[in-house]
A protein has these predicted regions:
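Short, acidic loop-to-helix structural element flanking the phosphoryl-transfer center
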Residues: 38-55, 87-99
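C-terminal cap/substrate-recognition subdomain and adjoining C-terminal extension
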Residues: 15, 69-107
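A short acidic/small-residue loop/turn micro-motif
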Residues: 31-34, 45
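A metal-dependent, Asp-based hydrolase signature
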Residues: 15, 20, 28-29, 74
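Short, flexible loop segments at the rims of nucleotide/cofactor-binding pockets, characterized by
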Residues: 1, 36-39, 83-85
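Non-catalytic pre-domain segments flanking phosphatase-related domains
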Residues: 1-20
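Substrate-recognition element of Asp-dependent hydrolases with the DxDx(T/V) motif
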Residues: 49-73, 84
């Protein structure tokens, strides 16, 4: 029995779940008086998320933060499942896994 190629393995995955800080960012946060903390994203990550959504992949973002800018950015990329202000991301992940039979990849 031959091992599956990475493309064959990826074909079975229909959902990706991500955190924000340290996954889409490099952990730097810019602080300006009177503004929400500013995080920087790489344009290649944005392209990959947008492309995945267009291909029908379910993208879920779970974050402990509450940034209107981050939520808006993911919304522009087509992400419809954005969970912010989550104090226990592990519990939220378990909840999401229970309510779906998706083949998940955890990053």
């Amino acid at each position: 029995m031959a091992l599956k190629t990475y493309k064959e393995i990826l074909a079975d995955i229909d959902t990706f779940l991500f955190d924000v800080d340290g996954v889409f960012t490099d952990n730097r946060v810019l602080l300006y008086a009177g503004l929400d903390p500013v995080r920087t994203f790489h344009s290649r990550d944005a392209y990959a998320v947008q492309h995945a959504v267009k291909e029908g992949v379910r993208i879920v973002v779970i974050t402990g933060g509450r940034s209107a800018g981050v939520a808006e950015a993911f919304g522009r990329l087509g992400v419809t499942e954005f969970h912010h202000s989550v104090p226990d991301k592990s519990a939220k992940l378990d909840e999401l896994i229970r309510v779906t039979e998706a083949h998940n990849s955890f990053i």
